[in-house]
C-alpha cells in the first residue's frame, strides 16, 4: 500500500509457466514494491494438475496475496472474492502496523478484546470502501485458455461493476501473455471502468508459450510507470503554486 493506494496484480491462468524468469521470484519482487499478487487458477472439470496448483499457491504466497483454484463456471464470484479478500488482508496488515506503533508493542488482532477488534474491523471496512484501488489484470492467453476467455471477460466486467459501488476510486489495466509480438503485451491502459473489454477480448488470439514470470515483471513495471507519472504531475502542481498560478 503506497500513499493511500492499494495495488494488486490479479493473475488468471490455467497452467504452469514454461518460459522466462521464475514467477515466484517475480511475485516476491512485486511484493517488495508494495504490490499484492493474487492468483486464480482455472482448471478443467474433473482435471486437476498438481504442478499447476502448486505454482498458483506459490506465486500468491510469494506475492503476499490470495489464491484460488476454480472451474471456469465459478470464475465470476471467485474474481470478486479474491480481490476483496486481498484488500481486507492488506488493510488489516496496515492497521496492525499502526496499532503496533501506537501501543509500542507487537499486538495481534486476536489479542484485542472483542470490542476493540470490532472497532479495528470497522476501520478496515471503511478503508476498503474509500482507498484508491489499482488492479492490473494479467490474463494467460496460451492455447488452452481459448475456450475460457469469454468467461474471463464476463468475470472481469462483473468485478468492475462490483467495485464501482465503492466510494473510493478504482483503476484497472490489463496485460496478456503471451502477446502477439512480445512475451507480454499491455492491451488496456489504466482506466476507471472495464466496459471496453467486450471489444478487446474479441480481438484476442491464443497460442504459444506461458511466460508467467515475465508477465509479473511487466505488471510491476506498469505500476512504477503510473507512480512516476503521478510524481511528475505533483511536481507540476507545486511549480504552478510557486508561481501563483
Swiss-Prot record:
InterPro entries the record matches: VWF_A, vWFA_dom_sf
UniProt name for this protein: Uncharacterized protein YabS
Gene source species: Bacillus subtilis (strain 168)
Amino acid at each position: 500500500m503506497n500513499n493511500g493506494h492499494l495495488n494488486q496484480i490479479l493473475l488468471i491462468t490455467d497452467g504452469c509457466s514454461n518460459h522466462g524468469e521464475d514467477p515466484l521470484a517475480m511475485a516476491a519482487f512485486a511484493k517488495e514494491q508494495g504490490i499484492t499478487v493474487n492468483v486464480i487458477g482455472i482448471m478443467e472439470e474433473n482435471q486437476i494438475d498438481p504442478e499447476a496448483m502448486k505454482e498458483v499457491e506459490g506465486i500468491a504466497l510469494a506475492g503476499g496475496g490470495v489464491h484460488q483454484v476454480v472451474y471456469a463456471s465459478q470464475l465470476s464470484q471467485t474474481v470478486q472474492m479474491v480481490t476483496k479478500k486481498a484488500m481486507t488482508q492488506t488493510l488489516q496488515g496496515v492497521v496492525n502496523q499502526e496499532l503496533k506503533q501506537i501501543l509500542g508493542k507487537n499486538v495481534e488482532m486476536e489479542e484485542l478484546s472483542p470490542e476493540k477488534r470490532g472497532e479495528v474491523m470497522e476501520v478496515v471496512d471503511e478503508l476498503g470502501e474509500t482507498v484508491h484501488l489499482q488492479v492490473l489484470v494479467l490474463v494467460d492467453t496460451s492455447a488452452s485458455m481459448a475456450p475460457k476467455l469469454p468467461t474471463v471477460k464476463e468475470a472481469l466486467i462483473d468485478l468492475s461493476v462490483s467495485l464501482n459501488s465503492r466510494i473510493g476510486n478504482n483503476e484497472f489495466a490489463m496485460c496478456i501473455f503471451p502477446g502477439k509480438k512480445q512475451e507480454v503485451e499491455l492491451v488496456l491502459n489504466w482506466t476507471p471502468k472495464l466496459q471496453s473489454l467486450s471489444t478487446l477480448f474479441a480481438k484476442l488470439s491464443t497460442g504459444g508459450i506461458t511466460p508467467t514470470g515475465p508477465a509479473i515483471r511487466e505488471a510491476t513495471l506498469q505500476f512504477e510507470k503510473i507512480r512516476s507519472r503521478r510524481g511528475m504531475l505533483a511536481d507540476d502542481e507545486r511549480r504552478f503554486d510557486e508561481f501563483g498560478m
